[in-house]
Amino acid sequence: MIYHKHLLINAKIDMPIKEEQKAVYFLSNLVDSIGMKAIITPVARYVDKPGNRGMTAVVLIETSHIAFHIWDELSPALIQFDLYTCGELELSKVLTVFTETFRPLDLEYVLFDRENGFVKEASGNTRGLHESDL
């Protein structure tokens, strides 16, 4: 069966990833943890442009993509994360790997079912997120 799940995360973090190999590891670990299959090796690059300084990373998966950018000039740093899949998605697994890696100070997420438009399936933030939800 084909699904259309789109997860967006916006989080503030104290210790942003600045090394490309750590960003690649995060994406590889996430892909494995959620039972997806990468169709290319994850790619990460540090962008050293004032106003847009930070890490950008992407991996193509059989069912679409996972990407993020971290703006580390900000304090705390900001990460925008995007996962789209035509496969099943266990939100709790993604949130667990994300929070274990980035230890966000503040986190907001929204999961859309895009089968017939943009139907909000789930949303939350650190103020309402409990370990039992992960």
Task: Enumerate the language-model features and the residues they cover.
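Polybasic/polar functional segments that serve as interface/processing modules
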Residues: 1-134
